[in-house]
Amino acid sequence: MSTPQETEASPRTVWVADPMHTQVEFAAKHLGMMTVRGHFADVTITGTIDPFQHDATSLEVTIQTASIRTNNEQRDNDLRASNFLEVDTYSTITFKSSTVEHVGGDRYTLSGDLTIKGTTHPVTLHVVRYGEFNDPRMGHRISYGAEATINRKDFGMTFNALLDGRWVVSDEVQILIEGELVERPQA
């Protein structure tokens, strides 16, 4: 997701996420008052980026659902259970891109299919390219951030309860991805 002047990568270069510098986070309202945040500890991102032809760019994200963390073991177990992610049946969340659009400057939209609990819906990620650099130790890298908002009920996570007139969990969930993609050496 770079312009030809911005990248030194050869066309259709394969990239992978650096797991030490990549995070997928989420946020949802609890009782309409507080934002609960969490992340997934096991995420893989791979793809091909062609700086000359955005339509040749494709990315795939795979998240291991059991790796969900919110700093609360009871809540994590609830999120892994059947009311939410149902990790024993659905071990992964996937996103497969279909189109990239350059919005302007360092901003892009990355549209594709998000699959959670066996249900797939189109989602558009709003992407900001933070920069690109060559690190002699760690390789050629592109740094980015992306975000989207989804309705969890669209993906079969319909549990909710009213407490004192307030819903326990918001329907809207914000997804935030930040990280570094590393150019994979070509064989």
Spans of model-derived segments:
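Low-complexity, acidic/polar, glycine-enriched regions of mature
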Residues: 1-187
